[in-house]
Amino acid sequence: MHDRYWVRARHLKAFNWNVVVCFYREKRWCESCKKVRSEWIDWLCPTSPHMTLELCWWINRLSEITSVLQVSKLESIDKMATYKVDKHILQRLLQGYKIPNVTHISVDEVYARSPVQQKENETRDDLFLTVIVDHRTHKVIWVSQSRRKEALDTFFEMIGPEGCKQIKVVTCDQHRGYGESVAQYCPGADLVWDRFHLVQNFNEALNEERKKEWDKYGNPADGDDLLAAKYRYIYLTKSKNRSALDKWHIKEVMSKNEKISYMEFIKEHFHKMFDCTSENEAKEMLNECYEWSVQAKASNLVKYFWSLMERNELWNYFKHKITSGVSEGINRAIKTLKWQAYGYKDMVYFALKIMQKCGYLNSRYALSWLYNENT
């Protein structure tokens, strides 16, 4: 024995009393490392040797329902130590995690960092995380760093060729990198563009046309500001969702501006297109929207509709009638998680927390492999 030192290790409370395990820990010569090392004690936490492993598992369980800060206050443990312990347990759970077999997945990015945290060798794409969700269970099955093509490539490489063959449908937004990754690894899968993002891009084109009309005919000096930016949401809202005042507003503008009348009919027609029961019916309605845009000389809408004409990603929606709405719900949960912790600096830890809160990396699911392994 080279030396020994006194250790006071925190343990789980007993009858609301703090429990501390006190013992001597020896230091001996290690033939493998060729230096003096402290003896290995398997019931101590490797990242925080002043805590027992049982206490670490308990901290991880508590962090499933509240923030690390609140857990540290509840257990009277340093916040940084609580964070390190929680990350260690999550990484240990990740070692035994197996991505489940999936056939329908939703892929979406979530904003993880602000531009202030962007490093010199990074681009804006690196500020995001790519979140993959199973449509059947509505659970997050994987989280990758950035929103590049390589982020989704990592997931497909992990599940292997056999797993890629099982995937039938992938829903995502119009991000080019995701589409290229799906085409490379899952050529037999149908890529479906999300309806929400399609409507969002349509609204942007529609708003640009409103701006043109405002620049051409708007006259705030005479009180004629019905086309002003403060009323832009009236022009983007469906007719059935407008208030009585909004309906009067749009009727007043349509009586004076023929192009706005065209745009109103185009907007309502475009929204109705998603209710079509067949691809041919939807194509006919999109062609009508395109023709009306040409007649109205709405160049932004013409360009937008033309870009959709031959895209199978759009027409696959009418084949499967599926969207990435589940990912939007998950994104709301992720934003709540981020808000609860006042943000994350460690993106690896953030990804693990997403899989803990919204996926299978928690005590309810992920511990089964550990118990089975030890019995």
Model-derived features with residue positions:
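Short, positively charged, Gly/Tyr-enriched micro-motifs
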Residues: H2-I105, E109-V116, K165
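RNase H-like nuclease fold core
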Residues: K84-V169, R176-S181, G188
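Short alpha-helix plus adjacent loop in nuclease-associated cores
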Residues: L198-N219
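Short small-residue beta-strand/loop micro-motif enriched in glycine and branched aliphatics
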Residues: S38-W40, H138-W142, N316-Y317
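Acidic/histidine-rich catalytic cores and adjacent linkers
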Residues: D126, E162-P187, F196-V199, N219-T375
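Residues immediately flanking
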Residues: S32, E109, H135, Q174, ...
